[in-house]
Structure formats: structure tokens, C-alpha cells
Amino acid sequence: MNYPSFPVRILLPNQPISYLMGLLVAVFIDFGTATYAQEAAGVSDEVLLELYQGARVTDVVDGLVTVGYMDVGVMDPSIAPLWRDVETMEHRFSGIAVTVRYGPTNRPMHPGADLTQPENYEVYRQWRGMWYSQLSAEPFGEFIKAGTVVVMDNRDDNDTGSTGSKNIMDWQEKGAVGLVSAGGVRDIDEVIRQKNPVYTDYTKRGRGERIGRNEVIDVQRPVVVGGCTVYPGDVIVADSDGVVVVPRRVAVRVGQIAYMELVDDTKGRRELFEKTGRAYDQTVEVPEDPATFFKKHGLPEDPNKP
């Protein structure tokens, strides 16, 4: 897993104490994030993607409880899928978080010219281009790869469309499997028709463009969505039950426990399908035996044994 480099800050002499304290806090925050990145670095994205393929939110939540993470990582129910297809299950996804935070701008909300006059259109065009290229761009795009979940903290954006139907398709083309956002999604009819997997708070959808409204604050740093802190590299699982975040440091064991629960549940439901004469569907296709699956991927055959 590649993490962005962290800035080195030097305490300068003859500075006000408040300034030095602020730098000290910043160093502490950077050190904490760097420590987390080192802690997580030994876990392969590829193995995690295989482990969580087809995972259900409920099984993952049970896995978190098993390792002592009660009520950790479960996003507020308001973060929900914009659409569902329980025949194909295309609304469901699991993947690795790439994080971005947008915030309200503190710059002038317009270029200063009278935009009601056609002769000022070029002023508007240049101002718009500057905003999208410099202030509210998508620098997180370089981190998107196969299995990425874009996690967007834009909870203070008000009525701003931080993303829409075209942006999401661009990310999918790069390999993203879905978007989890605090809000700020627009072009919703097209998003639904295109079946772009998006989980967001529908009541906080945004309609205005980003220009003059928001800026990129952070990329690949911890963000908060749905009441949960998400670090870059965490595992995200989303289905009709909502969204769960698995901290990278426990992702392997939680994933193994969730896989075992899924296998047990599928076997039990398949038996009931047979007893009641119900036709089998994809939800009762039993996954590979856990021990065999784990061994194939170099994982402990039983995650609950030392």
C-alpha cells in the first residue's frame, strides 16, 4: 500500500508560544497518521479484496464485535444506497478506501465582474477553469485503482454537487468499485440509470457546481463520513444494510470471521431452500471452504486460534 509522504515541520526560535504549540499539535497528528500507515503496510490490498469479495455488512459487523470493536465502523443509516438491484446485487461492493475531503471556500464567490453581461463571459470561463484546476480539482484520482472505494467527506458543503454522473464514471473507468459520500451528489437520475454504486445521505444531495463553493482540503488523510473515521487503506463494505468501515489493522481477522459466517449462513439458508422447495438463487451459492480459501491466500486456517 502506498501512502503519501508526511510533511516534516521544524520548530523555529523566537516564535510566539501559541505558534509553537500549534506546530507541536500538527507534528503529533502527522506522527500518529504515519504510525498508522506503518502499522498497516504489511497487509496486501489484493488479499483483502479477495477476502472481502461478496462480504455482507452484517457478517463484517459481527466480525468486528468478535475482535472487540463494538459499535465501531458502522456508518449512520442515513448513508444508504441511491438504488438497489436485489436480482443482480450490483449495488453492493467492497474495496479499499481512497479518501478526500472537500470544504466550503473562504474566497470570493464570484469573479467580480457583472456576469449578466455577455461581454464578461470570458472572465467567467477563466475563473471557472482556475477553480476546477487549482482549488476544487480531483487530486485523489491518482490513487484510484482496481478495487478502490472513493470515500468523500463533504458534510459541510451545503448545496454543492461535489460529484456527479460523469465524475463517478471516470473513477469507475480507473477501477473504482463505488462511492461513499456524506452528501453532495448530483445528477442522481443518471447515477441511478447508469447503476453507479453510490452510498450517500440523499437528503444532503448537492445541486450547485463546486466553483465558488468548495475547495479540496485533504487527500489520502483521515476523513469522517456517517459518524465514522475512515483512514486511507481501510476496508469498506456496502450493501442494503448500509456501510461498514474495517480498520486496516484488524481487516484480515475480521474478514476471515465474516467469510466463515457467510459460509455458515449460506449453507443453512440453502438447506431451508431445499426443505421448503424454493428455487435456488445466487444468495445460496456456497462459497469455497474457509480453511481451503484461507490457505490458498496465505492466511491462518482458523483466525480464532493462536
Regions found by a protein language model. Give the residues of each.
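Long terminal accessory segments
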Residues: 41-44, 55, 254-306
